[in-house]
Amino acid sequence: MRSRLLPCLLLTLGSTAAGTAQEYSVATLADSLRQNAQAVVRLYETDFQYNSPSSATARHDIVVTLLDRRGARHADLVCYVDMFSSLKSFSAEICDASGRVIRKLGKGDLNYTEYSQHLADDAAYYWLEPPLSVFPCTVRYRYETAHKNGMFGTLRFVPLSTDIGVALEKARFRLSTPAGYAFNCRCTPFPVEPVRHTDRGRDNYEWTFPSR
C-alpha cells in the first residue's frame, strides 16, 4: 500500500451514484489494499457537468472504509463554498463491517463555518466528523454542488491524500461539456488518458485511476 504518490487531475475551464452498501463490505476488500492501511478509499467519484461559464453542477460519491479507529480522520468531510458555488444536497450513510447501514445523516447534520463575515466572496465551508461507534466500518457521502456567476481558476480532483495509512481502491472523474468545448487538463504524478464519446450535443470524458 503506497500513498505518497498522489493521483491528481487538474482541469482549467473557461470563465450517478453507483454501487450498493453490500459491495463495500470489508470482506470484499483486497488484501493488498489492507496491508499497512488504516483506511481505504473504496470509491472517489465526481461527475462534473459544465454548461456555460455561469452554469455547472458537480455530483460527488465518496466511500471510505475505516479498518480501525486510527483511520477515523480519513472519513472527515469538508465542502468549500463561496459566491460562485453552493451545496445543493447532501446525504451520508455509516455501515458496519458487512455493509449494513446502521446510521443515516443529512444536510442538517453538517457544521457550517464562514471564513470571515467581512470577506466579500462569501467564502465558507461545510464540515463533518461522522459519529463512529464500531470498527471496521464504512462511510459513504453523496452530495451535489452548483456553480454559478462565473467560473474561475482550476478544478482539482484529488482522490488520495498524502497521508500514510490510506489506500485507494477506485477513483473516477467524469466531465461533460457542450460539444467542441476546449479545455486544458493535466494528471500528476502519472498520465491518465480519458475515454471520450459524444452524445446528444455533448462531449463526455471519463478518467479512471487505478488502485494504489
List PLM regions with ranges:
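Bacterial N-terminal signal peptides that target proteins for export
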Residues: 1-7
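Bacterial N-terminal signal peptides
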Residues: 7-16
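Beta-strand-rich, non-transmembrane domain signature
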Residues: 21-212
